[in-house]
A protein has these predicted regions:
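C-terminal alpha-helical interaction module
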Residues: 1-161
Length: 161
């Protein structure tokens, strides 16, 4: 964007999302050291909390406001895979994205953008992360409250208390 303040905001978000979410999932999932795993796990969920707060603060639709940006694009793949794949495979079982109401609605909003649903395949993701493992067993869940990716079509699955 021409707006230098917006560009700086996107760049800052991109750096945080890459370090703690995109790469953070792999740091946690492929770590063979408990301390490295714990640090990556904590940074991942701390960043999810920060993003949840950001989306909740003023009811914004996307990370920087009312428009989809590069920061949203960077965050989407990891959050799309979190509940059905990374929760188990990457040992990121601190919470589901469904447990964060604003992130969940954001995820469903991005999934509903033209072409996004058609461009993603959880079958492919599950095969890639689980089918190539030592026993080639691919988990079937999660199945509640709905199976994935069908759940992404229901932004109101999360019920505020």
């Amino acid at each position: 964007p021409i707006d230098t303040a917006l560009r700086a905001e996107i760049d800052t978000l991109n750096a945080t999302i890459y370090a703690n979410i995109n790469n953070g999932a792999y740091k946690a999932g492929f770590s063979s050291d408990q301390a490295v795993y714990a640090n990556a796990f904590k940074a991942y969920f701390r960043t999810l909390e920060q993003l949840e707060t950001r989306l909740a603060s003023d009811g914004r639709s996307f990370l920087t406001g009312s428009h989809f940006t590069e920061a949203d694009l960077r965050l989407f793949p990891t959050l799309y895979r979190h509940d059905p794949v990374y929760y188990i495979r990457m040992k990121l079982n601190g919470a589901r994205i469904l447990d964060y109401p604003h992130l969940w609605r954001w995820l469903c909003r991005v999934y509903a953008l033209p072409g996004v649903e058609q461009s993603n395949s959880l079958v492919h993701c599950r095969q890639g992360y689980f089918g190539r493992s030592w026993n080639q067993t691919v988990p079937l869940g999660p199945l509640t409250p709905l199976s994935y990716p069908e759940a992404y079509n229901h932004p109101n699955l999360f019920k505020f208390p």
